[in-house]
Every structure is written in structure tokens, then in C-alpha cells.
Amino acid sequence: MIRLAPHEVLVGDSAAVAAALTRWRTDLTTLTGAHKEHRFRTLADHLDEWRSQGVDTSPFHSGLYLARNRYSEIGLRHMLPLDRVLVGASSTRPGAFGGFHHPNQGYRHLQMAALITMYGPLDRDVPADPDLAMLDLVRAHAHDCLHYGSARRYVLGENGQVVRTQYGINWRRPDGRTYSSSDPQDAAHTRNLGIIMEGACDRESRRLTRQVAELYDITGPDSPDDIGWWAYRDATGQLDDDEPAADAGKPFDGEAGTYAGSMARYQRSVNHRYEQWLAEVGAGEREGLQDLVLTAVISGDTGNLCRRLDDRHGPGTFAGMFRTSGYLTAPPQQTAACV
């Protein structure tokens, strides 16, 4: 039987779409092919193992409780199940370093599952810094719960493949045209709905992580010479506008340096751009706008968000900001072949 996320809708021949999705969602080991050196187990199994090794996992469970209560306010009442989260550790790759910014991980909507890695050195089963690892886990799971709960609409394409025509507040035509286009690489602001949704999800997950850090008096390392100092500020949403610098990875060796560089790129391209958009569009009303964005992403209904934007900035603001010029144009005519 097909497992659907809370706000997934199958359109057209729903039985055929369900059968195609079932093939994606039956075997989660297909997610781990890019990380053959890491050993993956479900998040539930890892939490049990860490607890048996003396790690205090209560920060994660407190974060889960806070997220469940908060997300119910914006229309999400089901969290990403722990058996749909695979966590990598015990790597055979020398110098492997994990956490939120490890490459090729995150929520996978076709498989309805998330792939993450334990924060810190991955050459072990138990985290080197349990406090930071729990905060990183709170952020990753809270973040992926929002992706899991986002509205999605699936149809079967002409080639028999599943096509996602809606994700949250963004759309895609069956021929591949997207509602909003990518930002220029060096942009300081955004007109891309993918960045808006990703930024909103991470802003919320970092806020929850900051609450957990305060609840358990977790402060992170004292010196910026320790990558954990940066990881703590990143996970709890306390990086300044110009942090970390583009060359943040230079002071750190190996994959830890790569991790710091990825953190810097994500901060600039996602979180900073989203904060700039909130300041631009929601001046004096950032938190209210954040809630409207998340509620729309979960429900797939942009009505209240569009009304707020229209009221503050004039009719048609949402489409004017985000819709590409060619999105609604007729597809090119197919020329009949001569016989």
C-alpha cells in the first residue's frame, strides 16, 4: 500500500501514480548510493544506540516536542517518521565529516525519506560532541519535517514517470517549465520560490534549535578556531550577515574545511537572501510574513499570502515578483512529419 506524506495529492490516474511512487518508496537503501563509505541506520535505531552508549538524547526529543506543537499551528500535524530518516556514521572514508551541510543529503520527496549524517567526525558510531550533534539533529529533522509536510501534486508524465507539478507555493508545467526562475549566482536578494521555501523552513528549524540550546544550556565551543563554534551559531540561527566568510573553510583541514565552505555558501545563497526578502517585503511584520509563507507551503494555498502582499504592495505582487514570463505561454507547436 502506498505511503503518502500528509499533503500529497495524486492527480489523473491516481492508481498508476501510486504504483510508480510505491516503487520509489519501498527500498530506502537506494538513497545511500552516493555514500557507500558510510553506514546508515534509521534515526530511531541511532537514538537507541547512542542512549545505550551514555549519550543524552533528550535535547532531540525536546526539539521534536517543540516542533510538533509549533507545526500544528501552521497546519502540519504529522511529523516525518523516525523510520523514514537514515543517519550515516561509522564511515570508512578517512577524515569524513558529517552534519547538516554534508553533501548529497536532505529530504527526498519521491522516496518520502530523509538522508542525513551525524555531526562531526564520521569515523565512529557515537558523536564526538554529543551536544552539538543533538542540536544539528534537531535542526535537520525539524527542517525535513517541513519538507515532508509541504503540499505536493503528482501526475504521471507521458513517459510513465512521476512528475511533481506543485511543491508548496511553486509550480511546474508537465513540460518542465517552472513558475519561478533561478536567481543570478551573485544575487544578494531572491525572486526564486525555491529559495523562499527553503529559507522559511530553515529559519523555523533554526529557531526551534535555538530554543533547545537555551533549554539545555548548550553554548558550543568558545573559539572560532573550532569549527564547532561556527556550527553552533549556524544551527541556532545566530550568524551575522557577513558570516561565515566565503573562505571560511581555509582554517580547517580536510572535510571539516569543506563543511565550513558549504555552510558559508548556504548562508549566503539561502538564509541571507530570504532574510533580505523578509526585510524588503515584510518590513515591521517579518514574523507574520514568515508564518504566512510556512502556512502556504504546507497547505499549497497561496490565498492569504497573496492577499497580504497585495494589501501591502499592490495587486498582483506575488505573480509580479516570482512568475517567469514564459510560464503560461502556449507550448511550441509540433510540426507534423511528412509521410
What is the predicted role of each segment?
Residues 1-30, 323-339:
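N-terminal low-structure segments adjacent to metalloprotease catalytic domains
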Residues 18-25, 29, 44-51, 278, ...:
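Residue-level detector of alpha-helical secondary structure
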Residues 27-121, 130-134, 152-155, 162:
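Auxiliary, metal-adjacent structural segments of Zn-dependent hydrolase domains
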Residues 113, 119-130, 176-187:
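Short linear interaction motifs
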Residues 127-139, 187-195, 264:
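Short, charged/polar micro-motifs that form catalytic or ligand-binding hotspots
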Residues 135-160, 202, 206:
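Active-site recognition of the HExxH zinc-binding catalytic motif
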